[in-house]
Swiss-Prot record:
Main function: Catalyzes the synthesis of GMP from XMP.
Superkingdom classification of source: Bacteria
Protein name as catalogued: GMP synthase [glutamine-hydrolyzing]
Domain Glutamine amidotransferase type-1: residue ranges: 24-217
Subunit structure: Homodimer.
One Gene Ontology term, aspect cellular component: cytosol
EC number: 6.3.5.2
Keyword ATP-binding among record annotations: yes
Domain GMPS ATP-PPase residues, every copy: 218-410
Ligand binding (ATP): 245-251
Keywords, sorted A to Z: ATP-binding, Glutamine amidotransferase, GMP biosynthesis, Ligase, Nucleotide-binding, Purine biosynthesis
Length: 535
């Protein structure tokens, strides 16, 4: 995606999106690695939230007119000469403000308090003691109680601004939570948004519901209705092309757009030959026969595999597949003719602006692996109906639209497909073996009732052969690696702790049913240090 087609995450766009009628909370990002979790926690309460970098916070605040503001954590120190700060307009507008970690420190300093470099740095789990009641703690924490939280800070507040009181303390933070009830300003040194703070979501709920007084009217049903109207307004009588992969994002986007404009939408499904077992047929049946969406199915497997012959480097595989996909998609789109818009399954994390402390915001936008660059090449405008949603919200929207659970709840699948689950050179033989082994593995997981407990599970065909004995004969066949992880966002992951009986029975079934495999291993690597995919 080129600069001219980069979507903006600025809150100033809110009046044009499907959220203008709803209460909103503005999240000012100071560079924390977990700022997105704040937005997700707020949205779990049915309140729409947007993230903006601190450099654009004042303009966003004035344009968005939020009902409350949250100041995120960040890596900087308020003691630095060029330390980022919140716009003072936020503190004079009469709206509730919640500061988290760095957000607490900048709030305290900007309002007249004192922050000092900590003599006792706190990173990781810590115990916090409640020394006074406040609205944030209502029904969650009691005075005198001690509770687990997650800390990550060096500086600390040592003198309160006028109007504030300390309501909790920790060993490294004598002033760990502060409250100004009259102005509805609250701040905490720990991170309530992470799962390592067990009661964190409840504290954020109290800020949203009890402090800000928001009722939560932002639902997937409301989003669906507003998105349909927005698509109709944007597209008018124009035609839309959507690159369909069969994944959750493109599937939900296609169904939502079709609901809005019907047969003005045409989907193009490119089968590059590296899909899972029966995946192509499943996608075609669902969209062409069940939803009656105009669909062009292109079997380009021979073209892709021919170009990939001899390619072993994983990055070279990705680039080759991406280049070929664009070529094939563009050729099919031109055959359709007359299309004005290109639909993408862009999600909110793809358009959030990252924060730079070295000269203004740097925008990190991940274009869809399939259609990046096509809007400009084909002179089309973008339709991105999911650009306000997180992944879990897309799944919820899919259920609202009636998409079968087998699609809505399916595990993430990489754009290059099985190519990066087959280290080394790709051949038809290897892909066939991998498809069958993967199908058996997933079937066993589903039969055990474990599929929904796992973030992602898949088989890998290792580029080695080992000696085995089957019957009375010596074998020399491939090794299959099994991978399954738990995660909340894919950024970090732990391997799933299957019991030995499950692994044993799954291994036996793969070896018995998949010709060309005589050994199965299980990957017990977490992320980090490993990645979820092998390539």
């Amino acid at each position: 995606m080129t600069a001219s087609s980069k979507p903006s995450a600025s809150a100033s766009d809110s009046s044009a999106d499907g959220t203008s009628a709803h209460d909103k909370i503005l999240i000012v990002d100071f560079g924390s690695q977990v700022t997105q979790l704040i937005a997700r926690r707020v949205r779990e309460e049915g309140v729409y939230s947007e993230i903006v970098p601190f450099q654009k916070a004042e303009a966003a605040f004035l344009a968005m007119k939020p009902k409350a503001v949250i100041l995120s954590g960040g890596p900087a120190s308020v003691l630095d000469r060029a330390a980022p700060a919140a716009p003072m307009a936020i503190f004079t507008a009469g709206v509730p403000v919640l500061g988290i970690c760095y957000g607490e420190q900048t709030m305290a300093q900007q309002l007249g308090g004192t922050v000092e470099a900590g003599h006792h740095r706190e990173f990781g789990r810590a115990a916090i003691e409640v020394i006074d009641a406040c609205a944030l703690f209502d029904g969650v924490w009691e005075k005198g109680g001690t509770y687990d939280v997650w800390m990550s800070h060096g500086d600390r507040v040592t003198k309160l601004p006028d109007g504030f009181r300390a309501v909790a303390k920790a060993p490294g933070s004598p002033i760990a939570v502060i409250a100004d009830d009259a102005r509805r300003f609250y701040a905490m040194q720990f991170h309530p948004e992470v799962v390592h703070t067990p009661d964190g979501a409840k504290l954020i709920r109290n800020f949203v519901r009890k402090v800000a007084g928001l009722t939560g009217d932002w639902t997937m049903r409301a989003f669906r209705e507003e998105a349909v109207e927005k698509i109709r307004t944007q597209v008018g009588k124009g035609r839309v092309i959507c690159g369909l992969s069969g994944g959750v994002d493109s599937s939900v986007a296609a169904i939502l757009i079709h609901e809005a404009i019907g047969d003005q939408l045409t989907c193009v499904f490119v089968d590059h030959g590296m899909l899972r077992k029966d995946e192509g047929k499943t996608v075609v049946d669902l969209f062409r026969h069940h939803y009656n969406i105009p669909l062009i199915h292109v079997d380009a497997s021979k073209k892709f595999l021919s170009e990939l012959a001899g390619v072993t480097d994983p990055e070279a595989k990705r680039k080759t597949i991406g280049r070929l996909f664009i070529d094939v998609f563009e050729a099919e789109a031109k055959k359709i003719g007359g299309a004005d818009f290109l639909a993408q399954g862009t999600l909110y994390p793809d358009v959030i602006e990252s924060v730079s402390f070295t000269g203004g915001p740097s925008v990190t936008i991940k274009s869809h692996h399939n259609v990046g660059g096509l809007p400009d090449r084909m002179n089309m405008k973008l339709v991105e109906p999911l650009r306000e949603l997180f992944k879990d919200e897309v799944r919820a929207l899919g259920r609202e639209l009636g998409l079968p659970e087998i699609f809505v709840g399916r595990h993430p699948f990489p754009g290059p497909g099985l190519a990066i689950r087959c280290p080394g050179e790709i051949t038809n033989e290897k892909l066939d073996i991998l498809r069958e082994a993967d199908a058996v593995y997933i079937d066993e997981i589903r039969k055990a009732g474990l599929y929904d407990n796992i973030w992602q599970a898949f088989a890998v065909l290792l580029p080695v052969k080992t000696v085995g004995v089957m019957g009375d004969s010596r074998t020399y066949d491939y090794v299959v690696g099994l991978r399954a992880v738990t995660s909340t966002d894919g950024m970090t992951a732990d391997f799933y702790p299957f019991d030995a009986q499950f692994l044993g029975s799954t291994s036996t079934r793969i070896i018995n049913e998949v010709k060309g495999v005589n050994r199965v291993v299980y990957d017990v690597t977490s992320k980090p240090p490993g990645t979820i995919e092998w390539e």
